[in-house]
Each structure stands twice: as C-alpha cells, then as structure tokens.
C-alpha cells in the first residue's frame, strides 16, 4: 500500500492535463532539446585544470587584455555574469600565464561579451592572448544569467 507509510515515495511523470474533452498528442521532448532551451537563460563555463577557454583576445598593455567571449547559444537578453577572478589567467606568447586580478564584463549582447582583464605583467600591447584556467586545482566558474 503506497499510502501506508509517510516515507514511501511515489513518482508521476509524462502526464498531460487538458481542459475540455478533446485529447491532443503528448509531445515528450528529449534532454538535449530541453538543455538548448535552458541555455537561452543560463550558461555555465567551468574548468578545473590548465584548460583554455574558447576565447581569445589582445593585450592593451603589459597588464591589461581584452578577450571576446562568444556564448554557446544566443541568450534571451544580454546576461549578467558571476565569476571567480582568482582562478583565471591570460596566456601570452612566450609566457606561462599571467594571473588575472580582476575581470570586468562589458560590451554585452545576446551572443557575446567582452572580458576586460587586469593581470600580472607579461607580453605587450597588440599581443594575442588566450583566456585560461590557472591550473591551481580549484574550479573556476563563469555563470551567464539572462533570467526573467
């Protein structure tokens, strides 16, 4: 008896309630389709090693770089960003990585944004850069949110 104990679990899924007496076909969507819909509202970028993000940019000076960030999917509105600064580096040709001390997110649209990064000294103005995790063993996270 499912109701015989308050600790019993009861699950119900794939049920569709409709008003009236006309039944329509049940449209069950797959996980991938639902995930793509969710990416219009939230996207999470998370790395846990010396891994490069898919974003590149250029140095403005020896301690500042601008990186273009393209989103996985167009978002429903220009998102806000939540980040952990200490876990990221800028990689410049000929260096092992410069620790980022601050990140500002600007020039935001529904498909991209710009990371304005202040970092340790390395390279020079005009050098190409790669945005990367610092490999410290912690997990760096960037969360884009275009919630309602």
How does the language model describe each region?
Residues 44-148:
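Phosphate/adenylate-binding glycine loop and adjacent helical scaffold
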Residues 1-50, 144-147:
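Extracellular polysaccharide-targeting segments
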């Amino acid at each position: 008896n499912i109701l015989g104990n308050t600790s019993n679990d009861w699950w119900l899924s794939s049920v569709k309630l409709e008003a009236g007496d006309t039944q329509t076909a049940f449209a069950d969507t797959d996980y991938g389709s639902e995930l793509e819909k969710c990416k219009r509202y939230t996207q999470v970028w998370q790395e846990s090693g010396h891994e490069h993000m898919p974003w590149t940019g250029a140095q403005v000076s020896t301690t500042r770089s601008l990186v273009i960030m393209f989103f996985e999917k167009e978002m429903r509105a220009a998102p806000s960003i939540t980040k952990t600064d200490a876990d990221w580096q800028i990689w410049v040709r000929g260096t092992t990585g410069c620790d980022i001390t601050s990140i500002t997110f600007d020039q935001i649209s529904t498909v991209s944004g710009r990371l304005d990064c202040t970092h340790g000294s390395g390279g020079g103005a005009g050098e190409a850069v790669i945005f990367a995790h610092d490999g410290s063993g912690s997990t760096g996270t960037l969360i884009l949110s275009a919630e309602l």
